Regions:
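Short, small/polar residue-rich loop motifs at catalytic or cofactor-binding pockets
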Residues: 68-70, 91, 185-189
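Catalytic nucleophile loop of clan PA
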Residues: 183-204
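C-terminal cap/linker of serine protease catalytic domains
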Residues: 56-63, 106, 127-128, 149-153, ...
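Short, acidic, Ser/Thr-enriched surface-loop or helix-capping motifs
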Residues: 77, 160, 195
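Conserved hydrophobic positions within beta-strands
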Residues: 31, 73-75, 106-108, 165
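Short, solvent-exposed secondary-structure boundary/capping segments
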Residues: 37-49, 116-122, 173-181, 214
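Conserved active-site neighborhood of the chymotrypsin/trypsin-like protease fold
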Residues: 78-155, 173-177, 234-247
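Surface-exposed, beta-sheet-biased, low-hydrophobicity segments with strongly acidic/polar composition
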Residues: 1-55
Length: 252
């Protein structure tokens, strides 16, 4: 199912980690689910898709809290490679994946700050992984964003939103991104944007701040940018599906 294809990443950042000498700077990931990180975003005029909330570390008698935020990652290889946003794992000294209650160590394979992409690897071998579309999404093409908006505050179940591609460039005419009106909220960072064939057409990256009174200004990193990043790291991806799927099949 779609919920088997992604991960939750938790990153406790240096700025707020007050137990650093005792428990270290750790990121924890639970499968597709959301990712959690700390430091504020540096995106021009739009807010990085993340949330801030208080998180108390396990096995701590200290009443201090750690600030965290959330995002999403997804598998692209059966060797356990996971794609997410670079800002999700930024400033993280260790990353662990929790899959059906079992925790796995991970390794950061590559990080691209300019395109906000990262690849991490677990020692798991997932049965299903995402394929990447051969061409970038077209204007008005239907897309689905999957992930964990608001993290686990709502539920541990994967959530989806549906919309279309509304522009072929991102903020400031960034042609490595596209714009969509599919709902994107805090916790969607790094999540897959898929088409009706079930292929990846983008990676959720940012939403224009609603404080500016603007709705549906959400952005995804294009499939072509993702493919270049993946192949430049010596990885292959699955051939794209050619046939459109029903909504039921997409969910399964």
């Amino acid at each position: 199912s779609m919920s088997d294809l992604g991960v939750t990443i938790t990153n406790f950042g240096d700025e707020y980690f007050e137990w650093k000498t005792r428990s270290g700077n750790t990121a924890r990931i639970n499968f597709i689910k959301f990712t959690e990180k700390t430091s504020p975003g540096g995106y021009l005029q739009y807010d990085c898709v993340r949330e801030n909330f208080a998180l108390k570390p396990k096995n701590s008698n200290d009443n201090k809290i750690v600030a965290a935020s959330s995002g999403t990652g997804f598998f692209i290889s059966k060797q356990g490679h996971i794609v997410t946003n670079q800002h999700v794992i930024d400033n993280c000294s260790s990353v662990k994946v929790n899959f059906y209650g079992k925790e796995y160590d991970t390794q950061v394979i590559s990080s691209d700050k300019m395109n906000d992409l990262a690849i991490i690897k677990t020692n798991m071998n997932p049965e299903k992984v995402f394929s990447i579309e051969t061409e970038d999404a077209s204007l008005l093409e239907d897309v689905i964003i999957a992930g964990y908006p608001l993290g686990k505050k709502v539920s541990a179940s994967i959530k989806t939103s549906k919309g279309s591609v509304t522009a072929l460039a991102g903020y400031g005419d960034n042609f490595s991104e596209f714009q969509t009106d599919a709902a994107m909220n805090k916790g969607n960072s790094g999540g897959p944007i898929i088409n009706q064939k079930g292929n990846i057409v983008g990676v959720a990256v940012a939403a224009y701040g609603k404080k500016q009174g603007v709705e549906s200004f959400n952005f995804g990193i294009k499939a072509s940018t993702l493919k270049t990043f993946v192949t430049s790291n010596g990885l292959e991806f699955l051939p794209s599906n050619k046939k459109e799927l029903s909504n039921k099949d997409l969910g399964n």
